[in-house]
């Protein structure tokens, strides 16, 4: 229901949603007018028939919340639907590798980009997502490999599939990451030719406006959209303290599969607590409010084209 809601919300406001880890749901595809298909190092859920239905492809090299490492999905969350999507056994912890198994360097990345272009008949852009670490070098390598766009994901990003020490202490923050990525593209003569998408810690229209002012062409939100869905919020159906031993607002139980509001779970009883239509409206309202904040800031700077 969460992925359906995000797809519907993106369609309502005219932007794109992303499949994220583990493949595409047909219901998600039907809800999303514009869908970005992620290609992960693990290849979990990868399906060429789904790939060709996307409006863009995103090769994930790293994530800002856990750069240089893979991920771990606890077995309690690997129920039938997830296991089917990922073609793996139910109830078993699923570990994602830190790198793509079929390429070792930038030359192989260029080959992979070419393969994805051929698979999609050259119809859609191919983006590369980088965790913000060696930003200058990594952005240059991705741009030279032929990426149409580069997603620079900062350390302020979130994840439910990594150690707390990595989430809190590894990577580079959003502002310096954008500046370094912009200058890397400028040195190659590719600034404004290769799209720069900022993600990680974008929580408001002000954050988005700052990112664009620093040189990003677009922004992506993750945690903010989950909060708009109702993440960490007490609802009539939920009882945080009784169900997970934590109070609303301090949940941090995404990895358990017991999300009281029905977002980070596959339990049918919990999933039913999230109405996809109502949730989509909340997310759409949030994105519209971000847009209005950006417009206000832009107008205050004397710019007439918002």
Where are these regions (language model features)?
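Glycine-rich phosphate/ribose-binding loops and adjacent secondary-structure elements
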Residues: 100-271
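N-terminal capping/small domains of soluble enzymes
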Residues: 1-82, 86-97, 108, 277, ...
């Amino acid at each position: 229901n969460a992925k359906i809601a995000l797809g519907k919300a993106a369609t309502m406001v005219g932007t794109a949603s992303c499949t994220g880890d583990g493949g595409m749901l047909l219901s998600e595809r039907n809800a999303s007018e514009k869908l970005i298909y992620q290609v992960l190092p693990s290849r979990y859920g990868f399906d060429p028939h789904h790939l060709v239905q996307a409006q863009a492809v995103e090769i994930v090299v790293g994530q800002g919340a856990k750069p240089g490492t893979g991920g771990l999905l606890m077995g309690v969350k690997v129920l039938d639907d997830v296991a089917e999507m990922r073609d793996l056994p139910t109830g078993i912890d699923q570990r994602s590798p830190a790198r793509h198994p079929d390429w070792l360097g930038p030359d192989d990345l260029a080959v992979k980009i070419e393969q994805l272009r051929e698979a999609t008949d050259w119809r859609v852009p191919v983006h590369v997502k980088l965790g913000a670490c060696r930003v200058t070098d990594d952005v240059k390598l991705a741009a030279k490999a032929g990426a149409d766009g580069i997603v620079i994901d900062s350390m302020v990003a979130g994840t439910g599939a990594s150690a707390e020490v990595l989430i809190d202490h590894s990577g580079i923050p959003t502002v310096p990451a954008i500046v370094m990525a912009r200058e890397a593209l400028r040195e190659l003569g590719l600034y404004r030719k290769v799209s720069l998408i900022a993600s990680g810690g974008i929580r408001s229209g002000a954050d988005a406006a700052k990112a664009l002012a620093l040189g990003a062409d677009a922004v992506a939100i993750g945690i903010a959209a989950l909060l708009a869905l109702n993440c960490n919020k007490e609802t009539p159906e939920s009882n945080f303290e009784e169900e997970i031993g934590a109070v609303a607002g301090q949940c941090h139980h995404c990895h358990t599969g017991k999300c009281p509001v029905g977002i980070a779970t596959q339990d049918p009883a919990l999933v039913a607590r999230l109405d996809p239509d109502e949730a989509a409206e909340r997310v759409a309202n949030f994105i519209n409010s971000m847009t209005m904040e950006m417009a206000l800031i832009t107008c205050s700077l004397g710019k007439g084209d918002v």
